[in-house]
């Protein structure tokens, strides 16, 4: 469950928008990867599995070339298929312990904890490498998302894992 030595534990964590236009997605990602973020999360809620697989494979190649970690949102099988560095799971997207068992101890596992410190404790106990709280700002992609108070970041420091602010940060 250790964090990979090849990836930074701090830095910018970018999340892709849902985009069916692969060329536009890849062009945007190439630009941001030049800035060397810590991680890039591929998030595409499309129901087209072929599109998601093709995009994820290309993003894996782009992130490898840039030395940036690739996290797949909500899809352990896709993360496994493309050799991603890990997966990010929301409350209804799968079990952290099951993902750890499937992806192994070197995978990066993240968990959405919304505005709930008990979820963060449970996620870390189940094997999460990082926790995410949010939305910290109003979000256009999830306009009804609950707002997470910034105090959660201090309150969760003792968990000893990186904490990520998500939601409405553009």
Language-model region placement:
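Short hydrophobic "strand-cap" motifs at the C-terminus of beta-strands
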Residues: 166
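Conserved N-terminal beta1-alpha1 strand-loop-helix module at the mouth
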Residues: 1-96, 101-129, 145-148, 155, ...
């Amino acid at each position: 469950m250790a964090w990979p030595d090849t990836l930074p534990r701090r830095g910018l964590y970018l999340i892709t928008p849902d985009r069916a236009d692969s060329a536009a997605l890849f062009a945007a990602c190439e630009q941001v990867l030049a800035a060397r973020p810590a991680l890039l999360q591929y998030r595409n809620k499309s129901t087209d599995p072929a599109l998601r697989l093709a995009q994820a494979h290309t993003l894996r190649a782009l992130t490898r070339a840039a030395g940036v970690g690739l996290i797949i949102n909500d899809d352990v099988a896709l993360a496994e298929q493309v050799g991603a560095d890990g997966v990010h799971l929301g409350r209804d997207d799968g079990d952290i312990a099951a993902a750890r068992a499937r992806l192994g101890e070197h995978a990066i596992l993240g968990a959405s904890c919304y505005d709930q410190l008990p979820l963060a404790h449970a996620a870390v106990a189940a094997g999460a490498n990082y926790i995410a709280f949010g939305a910290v700002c109003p979000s256009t992609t999830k306009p009804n998302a609950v707002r997470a108070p910034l105090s959660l970041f201090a309150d969760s420091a003792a968990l000893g894992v990186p904490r990520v602010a998500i939601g409405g940060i553009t």
